[in-house]
Amino acid sequence: MYKRTVDLHVHTDNSPDGNHSAMFICEKAELTELRALAFCDHCEIDSFYQDKYDKRIRSSYYEVAMAQSAFRGKVLVLEGIELGQPHYDPELAEKVLAMREYDQVIGSVHNLRNTQDFYYMDSFTEESANDYFNRYLDEILGLLEWGNFDILAHLTYPLRYFYSKSGIIIDMSRYSKKVDEILKLTAEKGKALEVNSAGLRQPIKKLAPEADVVKRFKELGGKYVTFGSDAHFAEDLAAGLTEAYDAMKAAGFNEMTLFQQRTPLLMPIE
């Protein structure tokens, strides 16, 4: 049983797919003795105006601020945001970040350009899945080149949907060179690699990324790792934390990271 329980990827009902308020989730955090959590509601840059993310992120920010005040001394509550596809419109992404002060910014890719989120796609073939995944990795590199974020979220995100919708398992060895390029750039830019446990609650039953990728990140000079449950329900808060911490320790990390005012702080994994 780990004592330093920190979940840095949690969504409220201000995310389109979220289900509970920040206050309700913090009540759950206090009951389960979670030490800290970061709320990181979605802000998909390529559908910012269409899906009214301006209103969503404003509501999220102020509701989290209220939760910070209410739970001060009980749970460390951090202000975050998950920027989806920020490099598709860098000017807008920078404008969003300039509006408010965040403790952490998660960078993610949920969809390729002018396509749906992988979550909404109906099915895949071996050929299409490999094509999508190769292009996804290219977009991750683009995200890193843009660079104004702190945590690289759920690397290998599409794999969970290739499997759940079409039973396809990607041979990761085909992409080892490109994944190494991503991990090396993540390390060089001082970004944290998130170990995301959402896949453990889905048919694929795997972390994103898996332990071997986390280990490779360490080998390539990675310093910062974070845990994110990617909870969209209060009951999923910190779910999979033990498996994620185990993967970090197996990879050679003795410390995990949390961010305050976008500054990384190392904490022992214990």
What are these regions (language model features)?
Residues 249-270:
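C-terminal regulatory/interaction regions
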Residues 35-36, 103, 150, 223, ...:
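Short acidic/polar active-site loop segments enriched in Thr and Asp
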Residues 42, 155, 222-238, 258-261:
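Short acidic/histidine-rich active-site segments
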Residues 1-90, 94-101, 161-173, 197, ...:
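An N-terminally biased module of ancient metal coordination in phosphate/nucleic-acid-related enzymes
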Residues 9, 29, 41, 105, ...:
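Conserved, mostly hydrophobic/aromatic
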